[in-house]
Amino acid sequence: RIGIHGNPFHMYKFRSMYNNNNQVTFDENKLNVIKRPDDPRVTKVGRLLRRTSLDELPQFLNVILGQMSLVGPRPEMPARLSQYEWWQYKRFEVPQGMTGWWQVNGRANRPMHLNTQDDLYYIENYSLWLDLRILLRTVHVVRTGAGAF
């Protein structure tokens, strides 16, 4: 994944998909992979891990290693950078996080293009209070499974 200042790092995560699966579903422009509840690439155990957000737990190691923060924009996949507009690179001015404004405001229930806008909102309004608010809302989102699939 891509982290702060555009530096690549290995993001730890439990595998929730079949290895080397080519059954990808794209959006109407054939540009972005659609994340959907019935994704055929996700294993049965993976579905449980994702629904409970347990697949994210290994990222605490990234936080301990200083590669990620608890709160911040999600780390991006390198392949997606070629689709970025110049203004979207601002997401990399702060450490990437395990949770963030997009995750507590709908996650996969919202259009993917809004995640960059949510990340920019977070960056422009950063404060300890906002981080605490996001962490508290994360607990609620994880407990209810909202937007997780």
List the predicted regions and their residue ranges.
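Conserved small/aromatic sequence motifs within transmembrane helices
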Residues: 1-149
